[in-house]
Amino acid sequence: MNPPNRTGHRFFVFSGKLAGLLYSLCCYLFFLLTALYLIGFLAGIGVPKDINSGPGITWPLAVLVDAILITLFAAQHSGMARKNFKRWWMRFIPATLERATYVLSSCLVLALLFVLWQPIATPVWNVESPWGKGLLIALFWLGWGIVLLATFLISHFELFGVKQTLDAWRKRIPEKPAFKSPWLYKLVRHPLYVGFLIAFWATPDMTAGHLLFAILSTSYILIGAHLEEKDLVDSLGEVYQSYQQEVGMLVPKRNQTKGR
């Protein structure tokens, strides 16, 4: 028979792992809802407030508010991803919950953006041709399809913090980061970002507010990709440097090496 203190310890460990797993699943569910809302927010379908809806304020103030919201997301999203922040942050939370908490934080900032975004309804372009309109709508959904596929080509559930808690639950030792470049990653180094760029720009009805979102988001993606690549070079070394030389970041290189 197990001593009471050992039984209590096992129950405590079991409860902690279960709580961590449930927490990561809740964060993942919130991410799914946020991602779906982002799609509706940009497309103007199925959401109570989209990128072009709302009472509106003077355009200079709207530009300022929207720029602050994008900057806030950029600061949170890139700041919490840096190694120095992670080292500090993991003094307060378990390593297995770090990624799920990062995902939750990003979703909360995005939710704030949805609520506070100020529309600028001035039309930039309006495609009335059925063919042109259909093409842009198809590109919009293609972009989101690329985003989803790109996450599964690497490790979807690890990217969003579920695998870490599931490994802890199953008592699996976390795998060391290893370089891999499946399918789309042989064409460009960041297909996930390519998908976002397509989705952000592909619309038959571009307003000034949507254009501002696309421009600021594109700027952040370029900056964020640069910061991410610095971390990847630090962790993977020459392997990733070789990959950088062979494969374009967002656009395929003309004489790109195949079969990596």
From Swiss-Prot:
The transmembrane residues are: 27-47, 55-75, 107-127, 134-154, 196-216
Q: Known EC number(s)?
A: 2.1.1.334
Q: Name one GO biological process term.
A: methylation
Any one GO molecular-function label of the UniProt entry: methyltransferase activity
Record keywords: Membrane, Methyltransferase, S-adenosyl-L-methionine, Transferase, Transmembrane, Transmembrane helix
| Bilayer disposition of the protein | Multi-pass membrane protein
Cellular component, GO annotation: membrane
Disulphide linkage map: none
**InterPro entries (alphabetical):** MddA (IPR054700), Nurim-like (IPR033580)
Family assignment from sequence similarity:
Belongs to the nurim family.
NCBIfam families associated with the record: MeththiolMtaseMddA
Q: What does this protein do?
A: Catalyzes the methylation of methanethiol (MeSH) to yield dimethylsulphide (DMS).
Protein name, per record: Methanethiol S-methyltransferase
